């Protein structure tokens, strides 16, 4: 998963894909936090991409869904799992998801803009010891995120100053 939950570690997706290929392994990534709007793992060489559709894609907290996309070389793996284990959405859930997908980019990019502003604000806040957001140049994965993503996402994590009583 990159960015990871909860401290938004960034993994070099292209290097993971190359390493997997060099050892004859199938590469797999959870792209939930980035979404296909800002990170395209297939273009970076990943074979199978998992995407939760519950939060960002759904957008209204009224569905539980997910998606798996595979390269043509690996689509049979996904088809076999789907056929043998299941995984189809109900008609109604599919309709709710389709409804929400129409506004995904508007919602996501507005949230990302707010995340950038909030991260900038929190960076200068005395009550915060540490902030995790790949959009900040101080983030250890900033350069990798900048290389492989078309934005830095909407999730921010932070640690309160030890002297602050959270109660």
Sequence positions of predicted segments:
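Conserved PLP-enzyme active-site core in the AAT-like
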Residues: 2-127, 132, 143
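Conserved small-domain helix->loop->beta segment predominantly found in fold-type I
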Residues: 116-167
